[in-house]
């Protein structure tokens, strides 16, 4: 071994280190979370939301994507939203629990406004982890 390299057949070859990223889609989300979301909306005079398969798939894809890239963003939302009927998206990072993510969104003016949109009737919610952090995605739609 020579510094950060290995000697192979008289030649010094750099040692390659590979980072393997594991992304786990976390089983999400409990009925309690939907109850919390709907209670929040109903307290503001809005109808309850129902879970949507297409919005759930969209939220799952984006949660996995954020975890794989270790980046919280809205990448892809605007190009995908029409096909799934999505109207708004909330993302979060750093919350270990569903209730933490909801509290974070309720405490943020823009995210709160999304949760109180009067023209949405359905949602998809997913969470994914990269081994260190957990990423959340809530997609709201008609």
Locate the predicted segments by residue:
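Short, Lys/Arg-enriched N-terminal segments with co-localized hydrophobic residues
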Residues: 1-12
């Amino acid at each position: 071994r020579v510094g950060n390299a290995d000697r192979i057949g008289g030649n010094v070859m750099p040692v390659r280190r590979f980072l393997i990223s594991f992304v786990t889609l976390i089983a999400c989300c409990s009925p309690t979370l939907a109850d919390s979301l709907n209670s929040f909306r109903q307290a503001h005079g809005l109808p309850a939301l129902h879970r949507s398969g297409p919005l759930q798939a969209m939220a799952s894809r984006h949660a996995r994507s954020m975890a794989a890239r270790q980046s919280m963003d809205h990448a892809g939302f605007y190009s995908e939203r029409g096909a799934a009927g999505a109207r708004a998206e909330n993302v979060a990072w750093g919350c270990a629990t569903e209730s933490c993510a909801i509290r974070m969104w309720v405490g943020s003016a823009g995210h709160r406004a999304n949760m109180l949109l009067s023209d949405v009737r359905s949602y998809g919610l997913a969470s994914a982890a990269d081994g260190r952090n957990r990423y959340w995605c809530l997609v709201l739609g008609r």
